[in-house]
């Protein structure tokens, strides 16, 4: 029977094994991460475009004597994003804020 190394050596070996595992790329994970990166780039571009369009709508509405925002419209946006759960509502509020700025500021 082989004697076990002291506890601190076990911890060092475990840490070395973990480092080796983490440094070895897993092709499927790398591919999925690349897809996430592409999706993030698309999402960012769409969010920026959404904010631009929203600001243009606000300017046009104000120029024609309307209000800065339409509450019922914003509620429809929040309702749409609520499909994603509670975080969806938060996401909708952030998107609305990006398009018009914070209310009262």
Curated annotation (Swiss-Prot):
Site positions for Important for activation via AroG: 101-103
Subcellular location: Cytoplasm
Enzyme Commission number, as recorded: 5.4.99.5
Domain Chorismate mutase intervals: 23-105
Catalytic activity: chorismate = prephenate
Alphabetical list of InterPro entries matching this protein: Chorismate_II_sf, Chorismate_mutase-related, Chorismate_mutase_highGC-bac, CM_dom_sf, CM_II_prokaryot
Family matches, as PROSITE patterns: CHORISMATE_MUT_2
Involved pathway(s): Metabolic intermediate biosynthesis; prephenate biosynthesis; prephenate from chorismate: step 1/1
An example Gene Ontology CC term for this record: plasma membrane
A GO molecular function held by the record: chorismate mutase activity
An individual GO BP term: aromatic amino acid family biosynthetic process, prephenate pathway
Annotated site residue numbers, Important for catalysis: 61
Role: Catalyzes the Claisen rearrangement of chorismate to prephenate. Probably involved in the aromatic amino acid biosynthesis.
Protein name: Intracellular chorismate mutase
Source species: Mycobacterium tuberculosis (strain ATCC 25618 / H37Rv)
Lineage: Bacteria, Bacillati, Actinomycetota, Actinomycetes, Mycobacteriales
């Amino acid at each position: 029977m082989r004697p076990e190394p002291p506890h601190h050596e076990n911890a060092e070996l475990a840490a070395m094994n973990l480092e080796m595992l983490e440094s070895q790329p897993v092709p499927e994970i790398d591919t999925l991460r690349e897809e996430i990166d592409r999706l993030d780039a698309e999402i960012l571009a769409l969010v920026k475009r959404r904010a631009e369009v929203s600001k243009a709508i606000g300017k046009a509405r104000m120029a024609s004597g309307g209000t800065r925002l339409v509450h019922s419209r914003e509620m429809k946006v929040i309702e749409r994003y609520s499909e994603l759960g509670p975080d969806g509502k938060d996401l909708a509020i952030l998107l609305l804020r990006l398009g018009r700025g914070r209310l009262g500021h």
